[in-house]
C-alpha cells in the first residue's frame, strides 16, 4: 500500500491552518478542505474567510463551507471526494455518524490536551486555569461522542509557570502537526495502535465566557493569577473601577500580609497594585483601561492614582 493518503481536511482557525500547512508539505494529497462559512469580522464587520480557507485557496484546493453536515446533500460532498481519511482540527461542526464512516480509515482528530483529561471546547485554557503541570496533544480516532474516541498518539508538553493560553497554544500548534504526520504514517502502514480512553479519568473543558473573566476576589490569589493567564488572549480577565472595566494582562501572587477584605487595595506603587484576596495578595502589574493600550501599573497610576487608593474596594 502506498504511504500517500487521500485526505479531506476539516478545520477553521489558525491552529488548524498550521496542521493543514504541515500536510501540504508532506507526501499526502489533500483532496478537499471543509471549513466554517465566512464570518463578519473587524470594525467594518466584513465577511472574512477562515485561515484554513485562505491557505487552501492559495494552494488551489477545493473548499467546502456547509453550515452543517447533517443534510444528506452536504454529506455527499464528503463521499464524492473518495478520501482515505478525514483529518479534523478545530473544525467547529459536529460530524454525523454517516460522515465518520465514509473515509476508508475513518476520521481522526487533533485535540489540545492529554485525553481523557479536558475533553471539550477549551482544553488549552482549562489546563492553565486548573494549574496543570503538563498538557499535550492527542490524536484520536473519532466516534460519535465528544472527544471520546480511541487514542492513536500523544505528545506531552510541560506547562511553565509563566505560560498563558496564547503561549501554550503556540507550543501545541508546533507539536500537533508532528503527531499528526506520525499517526498518518502509522495508519497508512497498518501499524497504528489504538488505546481506549479511561472514562473514570475524563474531565470536561467548558467554553470560556466573558462573565467568567470577571475577577472574583473571594478566590485565592493563586487561582486568580491562573485565571489571568488562562483568559489571555480571550476573553481577558478584568475588574471594575469607577464603573469602567479594566483588563488585567499580568499579575503575581504575593504571600498574605495584613488582614483585609477580599478586593481591598493594600498598596499601589510602580511595582504593582496589590489587592487582597481570599488567600494571599494579587499584585497586578499590567493593565488595560477601556479604549487604551495595555500599560504597566506604574503608567496607569501616573494618570489614574485616584482609582487605586489603599483601603478602597475593587468590584
UniProtKB/Swiss-Prot annotation:
Catalyzed chemical reaction(s): L-methionyl-tRNA(fMet) + (6R)-10-formyltetrahydrofolate = N-formyl-L-methionyl-tRNA(fMet) + (6S)-5,6,7,8-tetrahydrofolate + H(+)
A GO biological process held by the record: conversion of methionyl-tRNA to N-formyl-methionyl-tRNA
Recorded GO CC terms: cytosol
Binding residues for (6S)-5,6,7,8-tetrahydrofolate: 113-116
Keyword set, alphabetical order: Protein biosynthesis, Transferase
GO molecular function, one term: methionyl-tRNA formyltransferase activity
Group of enzyme by EC: transferase
Cross-referenced InterPro entries: Fmt, Formyl_trans_C, Formyl_trans_C_sf, Formyl_transf_N, Formyl_transf_N_sf, Formyl_transferase-like_C_sf, GART_AS, Met-tRNA-FMT_C
EC numbers for this chain: 2.1.2.9
Function: Attaches a formyl group to the free amino group of methionyl-tRNA(fMet). The formyl group appears to play a dual role in the initiator identity of N-formylmethionyl-tRNA by promoting its recognition by IF2 and preventing the misappropriation of this tRNA by the elongation apparatus.
Family statement: Belongs to the Fmt family.
Name of protein: Methionyl-tRNA formyltransferase
Organism of provenance: Yersinia pestis
Upper classification of the organism: Bacteria, Pseudomonadati, Pseudomonadota, Gammaproteobacteria, Enterobacterales
Gene: fmt
